[in-house]
Amino acid sequence: MHRPLRYFRDFLTGSASLNPARAISAPVAVAAGLLALGGCGSSDPALYSLAPVPATQAVTVDTQVPAVIEVRMPGVPPSLDRQNIVGVQDDYSLSTLSAAAWSEPLAPMLGHVLSTDLQQRLPGRTVFAQNDATTVPAQAFVEVEITRFARDGAGLVHLAGSLSVHRAGDPEHGLSTPLDLTAPATGSGTRAMVAALSQLTGQVADMAARQLGMLPPAPEPHHG
């Protein structure tokens, strides 16, 4: 590793010999030097993904739950919508993990995991995420806004924001609730935090399933 760098330095300063053999090898030395410099200063971050989690209680699907449900793309603020994972998020500060990144943009990943969680909790219903390829029109929508999605300074994992559900064409009779969920991580590493965030996302699915069963009946169509 040091010899190409020495040739690279000598070539730039003009101290390298200009005999034919050295002249031919000079471009090779330059290329090797650049590769060596690039290889010493870069490393790819580890990639992490949220994962669906099973329901913690037996599921009884209310007859009022609409047959087809769409999980809208979650709202994620720019402070969280970044490639590198936010490791700590407190009231006045936020820090990212330089060696850890999400495997895909956070908003669509969260939407797909939430739709999978909700499908597990609503057997017999069809649940899909916004922008999924489907020709079935949704009869109800689940919307999530995220404001907090990381550890705090003490190590407790938070998922905060809001959850709302409503029938298609009837948003004024929808139901909404604030989200302020916490879970202890099983360790201090990034994997433990992502696992805790996955558990909290499953709790959001639990809440959405209950709210969908509490929606008022679909309005009767008007006949003119």
Question: What are the roles of these predicted feature ranges?
Answer:
Residues L35-G39:
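C-terminal motif of bacterial Sec signal peptides marking the signal peptidase cleavage site
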Residues G41-A58, R121-G169:
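Surface-exposed short loop/turn segments
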Residues S93-A101, G169-M207:
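Short secondary-structure boundary motifs at beta->alpha junctions and helix caps
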Residues S115-P123, A209-P217:
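Sec-exported extracytoplasmic/periplasmic mature domains
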Residues M1-A21:
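N-terminal secretory signal peptides that target proteins for export/translocation
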Residues V68-P74, V86, F141-E145, H158-S164, ...:
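Soluble periplasmic/extracytoplasmic beta-strand elements of cell-envelope proteins
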Residues C40-L106, P217-G224:
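A structural "domain/chain start" motif
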